[in-house]
Amino acid sequence: MRKRKLSESSLKGWLYLLPALLFLGVFMVYPLVDVFVYSFEEGYNSASQTYMGVGSYNYSYVLHDPYFLQAVKNTFILVIITVPLSTAIALLIATGLHAVKPLRNLFQTVYFLPYVTNTLAVGLVFMILFKKTAYSDGFINLIIKWFGGGAVDFIDGPYWAKMFVLCFYTIWVVMPFKILILTSALSSVNRDYYNAARVDGTSKRRIFMRITLPMISPMIFYLVITGFIGAFKAYSDVVAL
């Protein structure tokens, strides 16, 4: 009797999941399999939807393409720099916001604005800040000149300058979401842990390392994973710049 109830419960659960599974199968699994099959077809004619043969030429061509290899290099640099930095800075800001009670909601709104701003609009702002033209060196170059440095063309100039702008832009765009998530995570930590630690005379640094970080570590892990995924898929950011 108990096994029958369990089987009925399992069947009911699978029926609830069926629409979502069908959606995933039709719109995610099938396209992935289809594209994987297409990748081995050589000499494909889109008009007649025919191909000449099957092989690994497409993979060989891509892996020997200098533009593709450069794109892979740029992507890995972007991921390695932006994900740890954006998460660490967001954690510092979220900790500060959590500690400051007055105007907390105002600061949260201000920090969240870049996340809801149009990507192209943000890209134009960065162009004005960094791009060197015949009429203006850009706002950042003006600051550099004030300190006695020379103007740098961050957009069309050296490789390091372009990567700096792209990394800075990516961190600035993704950080608001991370601040929001981490602020919520910090607010959910039970205050009794902090009160007990203060009674024992524990320092603030030790409280942060031993209580705060372990309690919000699942959210940090989530942000790191989603940050890696988002950075590997970054395309609109480059187009906007």
Tell where the protein language model's regions lie, with residue ranges:
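A structural signal for multi-pass alpha-helical bundles of membrane permease subunits
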Residues: 4-241
